[in-house]
Regions:
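Accessory nucleic acid-recognition modules appended to NTPase machines
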Residues: 66, 203-361
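Domain-level recognition of nuclease-like catalytic cores that cleave nucleotide substrates
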Residues: 90, 401-427
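Hydrophobic anchor at the beta1->P-loop junction of P-loop NTPases
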Residues: 37
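Conserved lysine of the Walker
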Residues: 45-46
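Interdomain motor-coupling "hinge/lid" segment immediately C-terminal to the ATP-binding subdomain
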Residues: 2-5, 9-14, 141-249
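Structural recognition of the conserved hydrophobic beta-strand(s) that form the central parallel beta-sheet
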Residues: 127-133, 154
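Short glycine-rich substrate-engagement loop in P-loop NTPases that contacts/grips substrate
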Residues: 68-98
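Pre-Walker A adenine-sensing motif
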Residues: 13-32
C-alpha cells in the first residue's frame, strides 16, 4: 500500500474533523478505554468518533496532529489487506516521529482479519476507537480474538429526544403543561414518526429517496455481496415480507411457504442464514415469545425494522405498524445489552401482550387509539389478565395521542401518548 496515500488521508482528516458541525449525543467514553461501536449504517457511529475527537481538542487533551483517523470506506483504501494495516501506523510515524496518536478506525469490518491489528494496538497501549456495521463484531469469537481489550457499544439512530436536540428544541421541566412547547414537540414528532432517526436524512431535500438509497446499500452492499447471496430476488422478497408483518410472529416454516408461493424455493438452513444476515446488518431485530421453549424462541419471533424511516418505505397508510415498530425500537434502545441475554419479549399464551420486559417488570400494549369498545376490551382486558398472572408487573398502553389512567379490578394501567413516553425516563 502506498504510504503517501495514507499520509494524505491522515492529514485531510486532521484538518477536516475539528471543523465538522455536530449535534452532541449523550455518550461518555472513558479516557483510557478502547471501544467498538456497532450499529446500522448511518446510525451516527462516525459522528461519535468526531465528537470524541472534538471533545479532546476542546479540552486541550490532544492536538490535531495526535489524530489518526482512517475511514475504510475511502475508495483509495479499497485494495488494503489485513497484513498491510501496520502501514497505517508506519505512515503516521513518518509524519510525526515519536508521537503516539489516538487511533480511530471507521468501518474496519471491510478488512477481513482486522482483529489482530486491533489487538496489537491495544496491547501496545494505544487508545483506539473502532466502528462497524455488522453485529458479528460483538460476537463471542470476536471477543475471544480481541481478548477483552475493547468495550462494545451498540449505536442506534437518533432517539426522539436527540431528534429534538438536533432541531434545537429543549422541552425543559414540566414541558407537558406548556401548550406552546407541546405543540412544537407534536409537530416535530409527526416528522420523526414517518421519517425516523437517521441523522443524515434530516437535511436531505428528498428524505424518502435518501432512505431508499441507504436501504439498498445495506441490502446489497452489507448483506447480499458480503455474504455472497446468489438469489437476491428471494432475499428482497423476504425483507419486504418481514417489513409488512412487523406486528406478527413469523416462523421459519411460514416464511418458507411465502417464498414457495412466488415460485422460488429455499431450504430452512438457508432461510435461517438469510434472517441472521439481516440481523447482523442491523436491518431487523428479533423479539422472542417469553413463554416459548428455547427452540421456539429462536424460530417463532417478531421482527422489527431498525428505523421507522426505512420501514415506511414499504408501507401505505401503515400508521399502526409504524407505532408498534417505534415502541419496539425504543424498548430495544433502553433494554438491549451486548451480551447474548435476551431482555425484551412479547407474550402469547392465553393472552397476547405486545412487549414484556421481565427485568423491569413492564407489560406494554400498543394501540393507535382506544376509540372502539372491542379495541378497549382487547387491550385493557389482556393487560389485566396478564397482571393477575404476573404480580408486580406495571401495565402500560402506548397510543398515538390518547392519555388517561385506567383503574380496573384493582389494577392501574397508564395510557400514554408515544411522543410523551419517548421523552420519559427509562422506566
Amino acid at each position: 500500500m502506498d504510504k503517501q496515500i495514507i499520509k494524505n488521508i491522515i492529514i485531510e482528516k486532521q484538518i477536516a474533523i475539528p471543523n465538522y458541525k455536530l449535534v452532541h449525543r449523550d455518550f461518555l467514553f472513558g479516557d483510557k478505554s478502547n471501544y467498538i461501536l456497532v450499529g446500522i449504517r448511518r446510525a451516527g457511529k462516525s459522528y461519535l468518533l468526531y465528537q470524541d475527537i472534538q471533545t479532546r481538542l476542546n479540552r486541550g487533551e490532544q492536538s490535531a496532529q495526535d489524530i489518526l483517523y482512517i475511514n475504510f470506506e475511502d475508495e483509495r483504501l479499497s485494495s488494503l489487506k489485513a497484513e498491510e494495516l501496520g502501514t497505517i501506523l508506519d505512515s503516521y510515524m513518518e509524519l510525526y516521529p515519536g508521537k503516539q496518536p489516538f487511533v480511530y478506525l471507521d468501518e474496519i469490518q471491510n478488512i477481513e482479519g482486522w482483529e489482530k491489528f486491533a489487538r496489537r494496538l491495544a496491547d501496545s497501549q494505544y487508545r483506539v476507537m473502532i466502528t462497524g456495521s455488522n453485529a458479528k463484531m460483538l460476537g463471542k469469537e470476536m471477543f475471544s480474538t480481541l481478548g477483552g481489550r475493547y468495550i462494545p457499544k451498540e449505536i442506534f439512530p437518533f432517539s426522539f429526544a436527540e431528534y429534538l436536540t438536533y432541531h434545537q428544541v429543549e422541552p425543559g421541566e414540566n414541558w407537558e403543561y406548556n401548550q406552546q412547547i407541546k405543540s412544537i414537540i407534536s409537530n416535530y414528532f409527526d416528522s420523526y414518526f414517518y421519517e425516523g432517526g437517521i441523522a443524515e436524512s434530516f437535511e436531505q431535500p428528498d428524505k424518502r429517496e435518501y432512505l431508499n438509497v441507504l436501504y439498498q446499500k445495506i441490502l446489497i452492499g452489507d448483506i447480499v455481496e458480503r455474504n455472497s447471496i446468489r438469489n437476491s430476488r428471494i432475499f428482497r422478497f423476504l425483507a419486504k415480507k418481514l417489513a409488512d408483518s412487523v406486528m406478527q410472529p413469523s416462523s421459519l416454516t411460514r416464511l418458507q411457504h411465502m417464498v414457495k408461493s412466488t415460485g422460488d424455493t429455499i431450504s430452512l438452513p438457508a432461510l435461517k442464514d438469510y434472517l441472521e444476515y439481516m440481523q447482523d446488518a442491523y436491518l431487523f431485530f428479533p423479539i422472542p415469545n417469553l413463554v416459548s421453549p428455547m427452540t421456539e424462541q429462536a424460530t417463532l419471533q417478531k421482527r422489527y425494522v431498525a428505523d421507522n424511516g426505512i420501514l415506511n418505505l414499504f408501507l401505505f397508510q401503515g400508521e399502526t405498524k409504524l407505532l408498534e415498530n417505534m415502541v419496539a425500537i425504543e424498548l430495544n434502545r433502553r433494554f438491549r445489552n451486548t451480551t447474548e441475554e435476551t431482555l425484551l419479549y412479547y407474550f402469547n399464551k392465553n393472552v397476547e401482550i405486545d412487549f414484556c420486559v421481565p427485568s423491569a417488570q413492564l407489560a406494554i400494549q400498543v394501540s393507535y387509539n382506544l376509540n372502539d369498545e372491542a379495541t378497549y376490551e382487547r387491550e385493557v382486558g389482556g393487560l389485566i389478565k396478564f397482571l393477575k398472572a404476573f404480580p408486580g408487573y406495571h401495565g402500560y398502553i402506548i397510543t398515538r395521542d390518547y392519555q388517561t389512567q385506567i383503574m380496573a379490578d384493582g389494577y392501574t394501567i397508564e395510557v400514554v401518548p408515544i411522543w410523551k413516553w419517548l421523552l420519559q425516563d427509562n422506566n
